[in-house]
Amino acid sequence: TGREFMQELSNALADALGQPGNRKIKMLFGEWATLYGQAADLSIQQRKKINGSLGFDFAGPAAIDLPAKLFVTHTFHSLLMKLIAAEIVAAHGMASSTSLIYELLALGSDEALIEALRSDVENGGFFNAVGLHGFVEEAIFSWYLDATTKKAIRTSMCLAIRTLLAQLSVYRFDTIKKTGRSRDVLRDFYQDLVPEELRKSLGEFYTPDWLVEHSVD
């Protein structure tokens, strides 16, 4: 499900970058690509290995293939984390809604779904309503909503989003508790999503749990 959604994101990004207009998306991606270019210096062999592990294609120029895929990957990660955070908040009785995901799934039109994602998730409306002001700040990863102005892209994107929402709806978020030895679920998810070689090229290194516990003890 996640790979299928990232493929839709990748298709939308390639289309937006290849067509006239779309200045906002091009600007956001340009900023991202510049930052990525400053951080990553990969060999051809490393690029092949990373591309093979991502699991989706990019139909745009080969020169921006890897930064585009990383942009897509982080967009997916950003949206998923916001949705999970909203469900945790709702599941613990902190919101008037019992599930934002179910509310999104109940929306009948693609246009309504896009608008709800924009206002409640990407603009932080859901979180602001429960007092979590400033929880959502990185507007750079909301670009996918602006890419849905074209009907064909909107239709396929919304189908992929609904599939993702349906998959998330089967999980129980009220069982997530903070315990001293609980694993960092979001950290583990991110490490599984972004290939290790790519994370290291960006200067991202994580201390193993056993070493942290040993150091603290």
Can you name each region flagged by the protein language model?
Residues 1-151, 205-208, 212-217:
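Charged, often flexible domain-edge or linker segments that flank or initiate folded functional domains
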Residues 137-216:
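Class I S-adenosyl-L-methionine
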